[in-house]
């Protein structure tokens, strides 16, 4: 017997097939999820039930019992379970009640064990994200599907009223503005969609919740175009890292025409968990990282492939209905609903990790971009609230990333020094061969100090007077500090440069042939095309050469910009690589220092700071356009 067949029969054996001689048509119309999870082992002592051998359902109480008190931790199957990583998972159990007539009014010990058994099957997907919360609730039982449409709807409403109350309690007492993942299978998936409808709409709270929603795993249920149109907050996932979206699919063999999950004439908006595409592109079994068929079982890599069919169903390949029977007779052979997350367990687990990482990156980008924006606005339009905004930004960064905080604070402090402090002076080279202006700057005359010379765009493959002026300033500094080195940076720039001369290459040649600087003292970066690339490339050279301090040599209008970028990179290098190069003073080519007025090109300093910080381009593109602000 094949391993898959043994696994399928094992699941069939432990399932309480407590259903169901119910009209499939009526279930199609009911719109509520059905139980599809094997019961707890304690139930195995009872014989499997079929449409011919059913236990009579427990009658509905005359007076409806009160729902759980979610202020009591015993009302939760999982309560803050797992390591606190700053992310929570609100996980909703699928149907496990096969006894009650309508709803699970009596959440007794046996039923609670069924809850835990079902949840433990799924837990491995989600537990590495952070704390898990899963409420006991008066869920719909299998037998509720025998009821009339109005009574069946009442059963769903009662089940959801508990989920809603639990979620409300969680938000008020446990969430603390944490990012959140909603997850559920089958009935649990439908309840996740109901939470989106109630809590995530266009309200102040809903908008805030959507900002913190990492994703929704609503597996084993349907998401229709009508749902999306009626509730814009329900956004079907389109890829493997999009945020605030719904991951949904339900598995079939490609032959099944309809199920209670996906009735005839209904199309669901699914995503393939193997290739994260929403079209019919086939993902072969090699993309399957591993099926997990029982709690603690070893993954089975490459068990099956999948593609999305014309009804939106996820068609599973490489397995058969005989190997993986439906386990519940409410489903036809070939309906793999019970295996929805089991087949793709390791892919879902990896995807959860990817989405959390994407969320962290996006959240980091937002707060860092806000800081950059406020620094820019503080310089362009000074106001009394600037410092308040900047400090609030730094506090927000510290709250989400202790690692980013020292870098962000260094950026803010240095920006305030070079851009906002009127006392900050630019040191400009005169016309002599030496640099007496640097005498009091505290620059060491050591091989461990570097003068970093930033390039300027070439014209017709040749140096401009401005670039020559920067070289003259650098040469004066080199003569005044004969033990220091020079690092020239700049790639092949400018129009009409067929021989691809580089700024750095021509600077080196000029410094040697015209200025008389020893070649052994000059190092070059001939790749940089932006100031940010100047910083990145020259830092690599300085680290290799054991440089401990540096002074930027450039034009006066470019000095503050360069200072901001090099300081940011210095902070990042120190944090990430343990390498520190201290910025000392500045040296400029100019007859007069630039006056403290806004220079339109300094907008790019902020943009390039974003590049150095690794912020997503889409977020940087949302920074205010300074040209527009100034009418330039």
What positions do the PLM features span?
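Gly/Ala-rich beta-loop-alpha elbow adjacent to hydrolase catalytic centers
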Residues: 184-188, 192, 558
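Active-site catalytic motif of lipid deacylating hydrolases and related acyltransferases
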Residues: 30, 92-179, 321-342, 346, ...
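Short, electropositive alpha-helical surface patch
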Residues: 144-159, 193-196, 501-515
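Short glycine-enriched nucleophile-adjacent loop
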Residues: 192-200, 567
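Alpha/beta-hydrolase fold nucleophile elbow
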Residues: 174-184, 522, 550
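A structural signal for short, hydrophobic/glycine-enriched beta-strand patches
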Residues: 375-392, 396-604
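Flexible, membrane-associating and regulatory peripheral segments of lipid-active enzymes
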Residues: 2-124, 364-421
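Surface cap/lid and interfacial helix-loop subdomains adjacent to catalytic sites
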Residues: 164-176, 198-366, 605-625
């Amino acid at each position: 017997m094949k391993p898959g067949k043994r696994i399928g029969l094992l699941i069939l054996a432990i399932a309480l097939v407590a259903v169901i001689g119910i009209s499939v048509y009526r279930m199609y119309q009911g719109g509520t999820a059905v139980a599809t999870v094997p019961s707890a082992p304690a139930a195995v002592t009872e014989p499997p039930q079929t449409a011919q051998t059913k236990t009579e359902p427990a009658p509905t109480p005359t007076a409806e019992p009160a729902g759980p008190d979610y202020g009591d931790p015993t009302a939760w199957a999982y309560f803050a379970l797992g390591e606190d990583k700053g992310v929570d998972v609100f996980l909703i159990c699928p149907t496990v009640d096969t006894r009650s007539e309508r709803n699970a009014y009596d959440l007794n010990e046996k039923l609670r064990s069924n809850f835990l058994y079902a949840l433990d099957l799924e837990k491995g997907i989600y537990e590495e994200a952070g704390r898990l919360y899963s409420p006991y609730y008066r869920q719909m039982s299998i037998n509720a599907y025998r009821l009339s449409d109005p009574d069946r709807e009442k059963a769903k409403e009662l089940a959801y009223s508990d989920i809603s109350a639990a979620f409300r309690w969680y938000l008020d007492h446990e969430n603390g503005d944490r990012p959140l993942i909603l997850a559920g299978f089958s009935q649990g998936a439908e309840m996740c969609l109901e939470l989106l409808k109630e809590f995530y709409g266009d309200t102040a709270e809903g908008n805030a919740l959507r900002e913190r929603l990492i994703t929704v795993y609503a597996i084993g249920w349907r998401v229709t175009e009508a749902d999306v149109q009626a509730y814009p907050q329900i956004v079907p996932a389109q890829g493997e890292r999009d945020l605030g979206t719904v991951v949904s699919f339900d598995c079939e063999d490609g032959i099944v025409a309809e199920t209670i999950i996906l009735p005839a004439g209904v199309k669901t908006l699914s995503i393939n968990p193997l290739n994260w595409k929403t079209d019919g592109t086939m993902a072969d079994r090699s993309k399957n990282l591993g099926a997990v068929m029982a709690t603690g079982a070893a993954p089975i890599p490459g068990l099956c492939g999948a593609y999305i069919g014309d009804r939106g169903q996820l068609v599973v390949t490489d397995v058969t209905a005989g190997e993986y029977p439906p386990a519940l007779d409410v489903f036809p052979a070939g309906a793999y609903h019970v295996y929805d997350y089991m087949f793709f367990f390791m892919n879902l687990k990896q995807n959860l990790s990817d989405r959390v990482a994407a969320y962290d990156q996006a959240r980091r980008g937002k707060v860092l971009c806000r800081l950059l924006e406020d620094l820019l606005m503080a310089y362009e339009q000074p106001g009394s609230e600037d410092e308040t905004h900047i400090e609030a930004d730094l506090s927000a960064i510290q709250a989400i990333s202790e690692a980013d905080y020292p870098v962000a604070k260094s950026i803010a402090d240095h920006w305030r020094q070079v851009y906002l402090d009127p006392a900050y002076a630019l040191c400009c080279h005169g016309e002599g061969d030496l640099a007496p202006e640097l005498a009091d700057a505290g620059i060491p005359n050591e091989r461990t100090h570097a003068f970093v010379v930033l390039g300027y765009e070439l014209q017709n493959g040749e140096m401009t007077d401005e670039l020559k002026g920067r070289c003259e300033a650098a040469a004066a500094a080199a003569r005044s500090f004969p033990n220091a080195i020079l690092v020239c940076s700049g790639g092949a720039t400018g129009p009409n440069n067929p021989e691809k001369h580089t700024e750095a290459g021509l600077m080196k040649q000029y410094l040697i042939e015209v200025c008389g600087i020893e070649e052994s003292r000059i190092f070059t970066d001939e790749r940089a095309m932006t100031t940010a690339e100047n910083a990145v490339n020259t830092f690599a050279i300085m680290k290799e050469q054991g440089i401990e301090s540096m002074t930027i040599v450039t034009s006066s209008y470019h000095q503050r910009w360069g200072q901001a970028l090099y300081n940011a990179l210095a902070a990042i290098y120190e944090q990430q690589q343990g390498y520190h190069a201290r910025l000392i003073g500045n040296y400029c080519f100019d007859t007069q220092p630039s006056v403290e007025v806004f220079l339109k090109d300094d907008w790019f300093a902020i943009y390039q700071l974003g590049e150095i910080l690794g912020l997503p381009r889409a977020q940087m593109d949302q920074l205010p356009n300074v040209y527009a602000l100034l009418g330039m």
